[in-house]
Amino acid sequence: MVRSERRRGMPLTGWSFAPSFACASRVSRVFGVRASVGSDRGATRRIPKVAALGANAALTLLPLWTPLAPAAWATDPTPSASASPSPKREVTATPSPSGTAVPKTSATPSQGASTTNGDDVRQREYWLKEYGITSLWSQATGKGVTVAVIDTGVDGTHPDLEGNVLRGYDASGVGSEDGWKGLGAEPMHGTEVASLIAGHGHDTQGYSAIAGQPGKPTGVIGVAPEAKILPISLNMGTTGGKSIDEQIPAAVRYAVDNGAQIINMSIGSNKTSWPQSWDEAFAYAEQKGVLIVAAAGNRGSGLTQVGAPATIPGVLTVGGIDRNKQVSEGSSTQGISIAVVAPSTDMIAAAPGNGYMLWSGSSAAAPLVTGVAALLKQRYPKESAAQLAQRLIASADDAGVAGRDPLYGYGVFNPQDAMALASPAVTANPLGSISEWIAVHRKQQVSEPTPSDA
């Protein structure tokens, strides 16, 4: 990994881009658009004008993760059956590795057990200390911030999430009205994502509160343990209900209209472009000042490039790295839309039925960044989505080639420095504007001429 000089507290203007896409029933034209990269240099990139996603070019939307193994712990001494590995997904290039389940431990430790290290679940959350997140809880815990999790549904009864999950919405038409029911081929995914954002742990006999930390002493504690989760369920990877073309815009609009300040989308597609039906919803979120964080995608799931919604201008796209801060071969992908990278391997999270799951994927990296954004929103409540995005990218530790690159984006996220930056003097989202993109590109679509019968 090559490091370059870091630039802090200065406006960074991200690439203005559009996804490359060719559809059988459409043709596209290419227009040159000037984009500024950094505050002191400009670059001209030729940006492909993209046509609407054709009906014959199916977009597959799925969670971005690889389940490794069910963890042996549960709040009940008997692990829940729902914590078993999920079935193989349609887009998985190879079967997900089975991993090795960790040795089963008692849910009730002996009296006098250490109260400083927490239980085995908590100890596995290496990112909390290694990235300085625990030190930020004296300044912010996410209290008063609502984060929408647009995913497979969230189990609000899990002890590590109980009380932090609001009554949400089902955008699919086949789930529970409140968004609490797991749906699709990976029904546990949304619960895992939510726990990394706003898990608060739970009480277990023999453990007492950890000094200086919010929440309970055992189980998963999220980056923003006092934030509220607004669950919005989608049906992905299985048939039934509404189409993804309908589900996504409905989900985004519901999140915005029901108080979400940040939206997490740990889901991705096999296309860099997106249906035109999504445009207005993402523009609406932009206009209302809601920050959207999305996972980049995983090579291990057969994705070789970032796919929508992570390619949409203005979305803060998160790639994955391993514990050595190297881009993960299987748990990340590449693309010019990546903004920052965060841990995505050897993760542990809460799973429905009072269980836990060991997993990897950019699905796990995104909620860590979302959680930090929630801390920043509490600490700086008057800052806009553009300013929050600026904090996160300007404070990142440059990695890979100097400057922004398609593997690390602006670099490895740095929660402590993001919190410490002076208020960014930016008015526009440094990652682009979907509203501007629509104005430039959607109006210039040209249909393929119909061949003459003559």
Role assignments for model-derived ranges:
Residues P381-D453:
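C-terminal subdomain of the subtilisin-like protease fold in secreted/lumenal serine endopeptidases
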Residues A295-P313, G319-S337, A349-S360, V401-L407:
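Active-site-adjacent substrate-recognition loops and nearby beta-strands
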Residues I232-A308, G355-W359:
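Substrate-binding/access-modulating region of protease and related hydrolase catalytic domains
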